[in-house]
Amino acid sequence: VASLPFGGKYRLIDFPLSSLANAGVRSIFGIFQQDNISSVFDHIRSGREWGLSTLLSHYYLGIYNTRVESSTVGKEYYQQLLTYLRRSGSNQTVSINCDVLVNIDLNQVFHLHNTTKGPITVVYKKLPKKDISDVNAILEIDETDHVRSHKLFDNKSTDELFNMSTDIFVVDTPWLIERLEEEAQKEYPEKLRYVLRDLAAKEGAFAYEYTGYLANIHSVQSYYQANIDMLESKKFYSLF
């Protein structure tokens, strides 16, 4: 979905890239299914719009060959990702996706991550049932704002609001490398977002509540509704 048009002149990938750029992130690695990589590259090009075309800032694109809807990946997925992380020299890594549209101040998430001193922090938002799909993770969060467990959304639940993971994570890079090396050794390694969900629950990650506008793009209808939302000035200026 990264290269889908949005709001007239934008693409879905513009929003996570802008959040990263606004937080001062200057090295980005994006990994995409092979059939989609050309349209993503054609849109990003030099990366100049996000400050990614200088001597000290850059981006890389990786590819994988398994189906987009599959939760597992081939060996090449983690070979590329781990190579990038080892060479990045970064103390912290942000993981963010293109199917959840937000305008988030990642500096606030960095600050809380550093304050709590845990290896992983996750961003979530309270949402009603109608805005969530069965591919989204619902977090159980305790009174100290730490994750205790997660599960896929169950449409049969009678709850009014759910703690939906945005699948935005801030993670200590050395710790992440060790965990991903373990994942890469499995016969059927899972995609990064699924690994991070499990790690957040296992490690009792700090849960940062995002309270701004969010569009969860999980179907044609939700994609259409997100575009229609932009006709409302409050939602438009919340995202832009």
Range-by-range predicted roles:
Residues 1-49, 55:
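N-terminal glycine-rich phosphate-binding loop and ensuing alpha1 helix
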Residues 50-63, 140-142, 197-200:
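Short, conserved catalytic or adaptor-binding loops enriched in Gly and charged residues
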Residues 94, 110, 142-239:
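Catalytic-core segments of class I nucleotidyltransferases/pyrophosphorylases
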Residues 7, 11, 68-76, 190:
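Conserved phosphate-coordination/catalytic loops
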Residues 57-138:
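Conserved beta-loop-beta/alpha segment of the NTase-like Rossmann-fold superfamily
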Residues 12-16, 76-81, 195:
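Well-ordered alpha-helical segments embedded in enzymatic catalytic cores
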Residues 36-37, 102-103, 216:
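Alpha-helix N-cap/loop-to-helix initiation residues
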Residues 26-28, 92, 119, 204:
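Residues at the starts of beta-strands that form the adenosine-phosphate
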